[in-house]
């Protein structure tokens, strides 16, 4: 019976090990080695009692909760150099005994808050060589108290869970090198008393905030837990913000300065402390005074220079710091925007620029001009308040709403789309901030506002509707008469005018086409006359030279300079070949056809010009085409 029992035990042991893997039973622990096996997923028949599971150098793409279910005794899990792109929620939920987790060399781009939940006793977490761009703030929460080594190097991280990392009291090694980190929160390493190695090489750090952790690396013998700090390969900005680091005197490091230009490329520890300087802020330009209508957007600008770049703040008229809200936005570049201005937004704003070298301030005044509303009156009570266009120019012409001593508003130089509004100040009155023009047309009842500076006494209205009636009123905006008013408005006068109708293009087209037709006709006659005159001169000159009728060119033979040419042979007379109707041979013979050809040429030229310009005339104005045709016939 012994041999069959032995075979059964061997068979059961072989079935517990996945086919492509190698299983080693070393005393009480079981190791499953599945590296370099070409696996596409975690083998489902791995012994649940496995203590060490190596799945490195395969092609596994995703991890899920069933892959490691009930492996409560697993201590070491290696998944390095696979193609893992996704880790499901609580994939390691049953690995309560796990001490070491290697996920380096994969294709992870993100770790969620529940991706690493489960291994509460994890001590070594290796995530280097991935494509991580984000790690959720709570990703490390399950093993904050137990983690000793954390490696997230060679990724694309701009931020890491600083709050979680700063709460790891047992952390010994932290590798953050070769990422895109550009800032460290102040005091983030203050609680890491056991940290012995911090690697920040090749990031984008321009400055480092003072931290007690860095002083432990200055004297390794005196420090109870010396720190090995590396931060070379960063674009350090060597100014007063890094003076504390320069005083640590670390002669073995090879950091260099990237800026300012005067220190660029110099060895960090060789720069004298006196050259680590800053420049106080200087307000380069800012908005001094801004006037806006009630309800409009207000943009206050403030620009400051300094080293380092100043931080910008705004203080409102109520001496409170202006922050981002549903109505206002304060941008880092010093711009303050108020979306919809109201009466309470008016006042003096203060722009504050600060940096470690000092601060600078600038005052910006915002004036909010209240829109005219029906029923408003100024503090004096005797003058009309903000105008409503409903009290039209017709009412104003009857003497309602204007004072006789005030000059009337005039609209002159009216065209189809524009009109010039003119006015005067008349007798001395309250100081005027600016003028406001209100108008609307019979085509559109929408009220249009125009703001004009106080120094102007005329304004050109553009983009008016042709052939429309307009009502226009002019108001003067003056300083507030009382503490509760923002502006006081005074009606200067109203006017009524009408724009001209749209001008037809027919007359312009007639003049253009008629002028072109006449030019072509006269040109044709001149060319024909010149051609006839030239032919006549040639005929007369040849006849006077020979004293006889000129021979036709077809009866003349050419001769060379080499010898005598043979006498022309006599031929019986023959009738000349027929000539084309539209050609004239200058053979010094019968020239009667040339005169006719010249006249036909002039007529054809005139008819061609008529076909071009006459078509336009026919399409635009038929009467002009007929007159042009009669003109061509009379001229030709």
Curated annotation (Swiss-Prot):
Q: Please give the residue ranges the record annotates as the region Disordered.
A: 556-585
Topology in the lipid bilayer: Single-pass type I membrane protein
Positions modified as Phosphoserine?
585, 627
Coiled-coil-forming residues are: none
Q: Position of motif PDZ-binding?
A: 633-636
Per the UniProt entry, the glycosylated residues are: 25, 70, 324, 333, 376, 440
In its UniProt record, which GO terms are filed under biological process? regulation of postsynaptic density assembly; regulation of presynapse assembly; synaptic membrane adhesion
Every Ig-like domain range? 281-367
Q: Does the keyword Oxidoreductase apply?
A: no
Ranges for the LRRCT domain? 234-280
Q: Where are the LRR repeats?
A: 49-70, 73-94, 97-118, 121-142, 146-169, 170-191, 194-215
The SS bond pairs are: 302-351
Keywords in alphabetical order, please.
Disulfide bond, Glycoprotein, Immunoglobulin domain, Leucine-rich repeat, Membrane, Phosphoprotein, Repeat, Signal, Transmembrane, Transmembrane helix
Instruction: Identify its protein family.
Output: Belongs to the LRFN family.
Q: What is this protein called?
A: Leucine-rich repeat and fibronectin type-III domain-containing protein 4
- Source organism per entry reads Mus musculus (Mouse)
Q: Which gene encodes it?
A: Lrfn4
């Amino acid at each position: 019976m012994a041999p069959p029992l032995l075979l059964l035990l061997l068979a059961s042991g072989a079935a517990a090990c996945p086919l492509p893997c190698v299983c080693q039973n070393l005393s009480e622990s079981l190791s499953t080695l599945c590296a370099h096996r070409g696996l596409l997923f975690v083998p489902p028949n791995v012994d649940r009692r496995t203590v060490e599971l190596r799945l490195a150098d395969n092609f596994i793409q995703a991890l899920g909760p069933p892959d490691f279910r009930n492996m409560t005794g697993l201590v070491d899990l290696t998944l390095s150099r696979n193609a893992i792109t996704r880790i499901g929620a609580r994939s390691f939920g049953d690995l309560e005994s796990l001490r070491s987790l290697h996920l380096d060399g994969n294709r992870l781009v993100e770790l969620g808050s529940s991706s690493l939940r489960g291994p509460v006793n994890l001590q070594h977490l290796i995530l280097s060589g991935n494509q991580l761009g984000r790690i959720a703030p709570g990703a490390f929460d399950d093993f904050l108290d137990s983690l000793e080594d954390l490696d997230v190097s060679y990724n694309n991280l701009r931020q890491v869970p600083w709050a979680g990392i700063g709460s790891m009291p047992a952390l010994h090694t932290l590798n953050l090198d070769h990422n895109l980190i550009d800032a460290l929160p102040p005091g983030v390493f203050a609680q890491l008393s056991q940290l012995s190695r911090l690697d920040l090489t090749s990031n984008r750090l321009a400055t480092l905030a003072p931290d007690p952790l860095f002083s432990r690396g200055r004297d390794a013998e005196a420090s109870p837990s010396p720190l090995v700090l590396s931060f070379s390969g960063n674009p350090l900005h060597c100014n007063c913000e890094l003076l504390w680091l320069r005083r640590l005197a670390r002669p073995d490091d090879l950091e260099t300065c990237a800026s300012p230009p005067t220190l660029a490329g110099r060895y960090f520890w060789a720069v004298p402390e006196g050259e680590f300087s800053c420049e106080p802020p200087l307000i380069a330009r800012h908005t001094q005074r801004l006037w806006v209508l009630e309800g409009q957007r207000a943009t206050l600008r403030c620009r400051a220079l300094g080293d380092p770049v100043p931080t910008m703040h705004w203080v409102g008229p109520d001496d409170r710091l202006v922050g981002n809200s549903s109505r206002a936005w304060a941008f880092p570049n010093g711009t303050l925007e108020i979306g919809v201005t109201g009466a309470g937004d008016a006042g003096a704003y203060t722009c504050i620029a600060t940096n470690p070298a000092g601060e600078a301030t600038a005052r910006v005044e915002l004036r909010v001009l209240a829109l005219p509303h029906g029923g408003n009156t100024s503090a004096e009570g005797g003058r009309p308040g903000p105008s409503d266009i409903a009290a039209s120019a017709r009412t104003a012409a009857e003497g309602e709403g204007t004072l006789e001593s005030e000059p009337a508003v005039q609209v002159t130089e009216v065209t189809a789309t524009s009109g010039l509004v003119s006015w005067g100040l008349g007798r001395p009155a309250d100081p005027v901030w600016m003028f406001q023009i209100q108008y609307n047309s019979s085509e559109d009842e929408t009220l249009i506002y125009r703001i004009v500076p106080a120094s102007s006494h005329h304004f050109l209205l553009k983009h008016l509707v042709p052939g429309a009636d307009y009502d226009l009123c002019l108001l003067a905006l003056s300083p507030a008469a009382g503490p509760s008013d923002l502006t006081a408005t005074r009606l200067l006068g109203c006017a009524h005018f009408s724009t001209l109708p749209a001008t037809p293009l027919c007359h312009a087209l007639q003049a253009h086409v008629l002028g072109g037709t006449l030019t072509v006709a006269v040109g044709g006659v001149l060319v024909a006359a010149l051609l006839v005159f030239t032919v006549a001169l040639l005929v007369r000159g040849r006849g006077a030279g020979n004293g006889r009728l000129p021979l036709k060119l077809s009866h003349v033979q050419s001769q060379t300079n080499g010898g005598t040419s043979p006498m022309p042979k006599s031929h019986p007379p023959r009738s000349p070949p027929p000539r084309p109707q539209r050609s004239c041979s200058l053979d010094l013979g019968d020239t009667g056809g040339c005169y006719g050809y010249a006249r036909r040429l002039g007529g054809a030229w005139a008819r061609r010009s008529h076909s071009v310009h006459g078509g336009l005339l026919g399409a635009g104005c038929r009467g002009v085409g007929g007159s042009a045709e009669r003109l061509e016939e009379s001229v030709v």
